[in-house]
A protein has these predicted regions:
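Short beta-strand His + acidic residue motifs that chelate non-heme Fe in jelly-roll/DSBH
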Residues: 36-38, 56-58, 78, 83-90
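Conserved short histidine dyad/triad with adjacent acidic residue
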Residues: 25-43
Length: 129
């Protein structure tokens, strides 16, 4: 069982929560699923991919949209204020470490955005029947 469900719908497993300036969790997204698109108000994250394959969409203010393919060993940064969305490949769960600075302040940190950059059918998005 996950420790929490993130505002984007992914599963969260706490690894380090007692640090003062950062936090570390493992994030999991089931095979074939797509997260809800969100942006963070105050935190920056570094993601290190452990297992699975997938895609990550990002759009930072004043910059072009970008979609990156990810696999074990991939690393990327989610800067403060950038909209993002991620998707697990069709065959395996996507798992990554998420280092957050400052530490995750709570669900109010994530702000829903009106669109994402990964096209999904209604049953692929997390939280959909």
């Amino acid at each position: 069982m996950p420790d929490a469900i993130a505002p984007d719908g992914s599963e969260i497993y706490f690894l380090v929560g007692d640090a003062r300036r950062a936090s570390l969790v493992e994030v999991r997204l089931a095979a074939g699923q797509t997260s809800k698109p969100v942006r963070h108000r105050t935190v920056e994250e570094i993601w290190y991919f452990l297992a699975g394959e997938g895609r990550v969409w990002q759009q930072c203010p004043g910059e072009a949209e970008e979609v990156k393919e990810v696999a074990p060993g991939s690393v990327l940064t989610i800067r403060t204020g950038c909209a993002f969305q991620f998707q697990a490949g069709p065959r395996t769960q996507l798992r990554f470490l998420c280092y957050t600075s400052p530490p995750w302040p709570g669900d109010q940190e994530a702000e829903a955005v009106t669109h994402g950059g990964i096209a999904v059918s209604g049953d692929e998005e997390v939280g959909q029947p």
